């Protein structure tokens, strides 16, 4: 867990370090500033390739691949995780909330599934375990692709204490590039992709807004669809 030291935030320290390095590459600056690299593996194609890039980019630093298990993803995610451990020749450390079993437990407790205030499950099952694990000198790697520069910028603005690296953006890799690289490596993509979903997210993901997404959920996971619909009806207008 990150703790602030006499008002000297990691972001301030990192920015000062960056400003002093002139023409050094971002990789070189990152390697000098960090004591370890933590790659946030999400059981998706992009995060798997981001892990591959990080391992290649930072051979001089300890690498930790960490996965925050929400308890609500497709069971095939475990198979993909195991395949990626073999592909990367590196173990994945599994982190999980000490309080909540899955997204359903969070929604029931919060009496809220998502909306303007965001989704409570993200904070409880993803952000919470991540923040409990991260440290002051970590270089944190996320699998933002070349199409997601805006998301990476927003993360930096909202998390100024984090030293963030986005190797897919640095290397100009798109989501389709990542999918192709996984397939070329002989790894079967997570089942959710093969069912037509764009991401290997929870079933269901309360942040999803598209009609197409919910049609796929209803088609492929009718029990979860009906359970979610019943929960939203029970919570009423205050729950969504």
Regions flagged by a language model, labelled:
Residues 2-240:
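Nucleotide-activated chemistry modules centered on ATP-dependent adenylation/adenylyltransferase
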């Amino acid at each position: 867990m990150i703790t602030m030291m006499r008002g000297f935030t990691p972001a301030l320290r990192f920015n000062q370090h960056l400003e002093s390095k002139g023409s050094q590459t971002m990789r070189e600056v990152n390697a000098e500033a960090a004591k370890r690299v933590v790659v946030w593996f999400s059981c998706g194609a992009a995060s798997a390739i981001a892990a591959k890039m990080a391992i290649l980019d930072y051979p001089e630093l300890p690498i930790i691949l960490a996965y925050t298990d929400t308890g609500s993803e497709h069971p095939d995610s475990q198979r993909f995780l195991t395949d990626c451990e073999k592909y990367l020749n590196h173990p994945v450390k599994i982190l999980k909330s000490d309080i909540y079993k899955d997204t359903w437990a969070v929604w029931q407790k919060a009496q809220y599934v998502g909306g303007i205030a965001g989704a409570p499950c993200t904070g409880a099952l993803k952000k919470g375990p991540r923040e409990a694990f991260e440290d002051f000198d970590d270089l944190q790697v996320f699998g933002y692709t070349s199409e997601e520069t805006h998301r990476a910028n927003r993360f930096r603005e909202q998390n100024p204490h984090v030293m963030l690296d986005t190797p897919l953006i640095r290397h100009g890799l798109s989501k389709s590039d990542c999918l192709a690289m996984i397939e070329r490596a002989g790894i079967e993509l997570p089942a959710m992709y093969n069912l037509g979903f764009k991401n290997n997210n929870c079933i269901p993901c309360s942040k999803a807004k598209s009609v197409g997404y919910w049609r796929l959920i209803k088609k492929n996971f009718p029990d979860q669809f009906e359970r979610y619909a019943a929960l939203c009806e029970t919570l009423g207008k205050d729950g969504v």
